[in-house]
């Protein structure tokens, strides 16, 4: 008997009967299918090719999900981090409890993916947020969505998953997004007051 056998280093993981365990590759494939499900078959194939070739494809908003566009200045003020440092990404993951966020480094923006209903159910908040350059992209908008494995800032790609989408239909909770916006607005106001 080897020392590995006696120490249990290679023992199989025991699961409870009836528990189905999905591999990361299975979750990623299911998430890709979910993201592309708003497209026709022909457009779906073109989107897959764009992901492979360019690392990004445009997907329609307002059916499966919408996106709240957040200026980097507001996100950085709310989190206290530095843009593109990785710490903001980590903090967003905590704040949104793993809800997916896309970062557009060139545009200095983040996109929190939220339920498709947000533009209809939060109209007053959205009107208030526009003064702070926050916009909700619903029906009629398209969002450039990176390939699921692009999870770090890389000059080779236009955008990346600041907080990766862990599985299909997992989205940010609108209330958590609203709280981040409120914290960012407050922090920016405090900075402006201190600069006077």
Name each model feature, range by range:
Residues 121-124, 128-133:
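Active-site-proximal loop/helix of nucleotide/amide-processing enzymes and allied scaffolds
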Residues 130-148:
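Conserved short beta-strand edge segments in small beta-sheet-based binding/regulatory domains
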Residues 1-106, 116-119, 124, 138, ...:
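Signature for HUH/AEP ssDNA processing cores
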């Amino acid at each position: 008997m080897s020392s590995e056998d006696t120490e249990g280093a290679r023992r199989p993981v025991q699961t409870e009967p009836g528990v189905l365990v999905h591999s990361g590759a299975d979750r990623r494939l299911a998430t890709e299918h979910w993201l592309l499900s708003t497209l026709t078959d022909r457009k779906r194939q073109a989107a897959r090719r764009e992901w492979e070739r360019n690392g990004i494809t445009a997907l329609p908003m307002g059916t499966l999900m919408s996106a709240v566009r957040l200026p980097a200045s507001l996100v950085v003020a709310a989190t206290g981090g530095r843009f593109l440092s990785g710490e903001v990404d980590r903090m967003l993951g905590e704040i949104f409890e793993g809800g997916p966020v896309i970062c557009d480094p060139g545009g200095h923006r983040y996109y929190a993916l939220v339920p498709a209903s947000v533009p209809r159910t939060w109209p007053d908040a959205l009107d208030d947020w526009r003064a702070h350059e926050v916009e909700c992209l619903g029906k009629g908008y398209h969002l450039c969505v990176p390939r699921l494995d692009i999870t770090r800032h890389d000059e080779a790609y236009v955008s990346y998953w600041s907080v990766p989408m862990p599985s299909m239909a997992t989205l940010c909770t609108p209330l958590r997004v609203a709280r981040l916006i409120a914290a960012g607005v407050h922090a920016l106001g405090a900075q402006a007051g201190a600069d006077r």
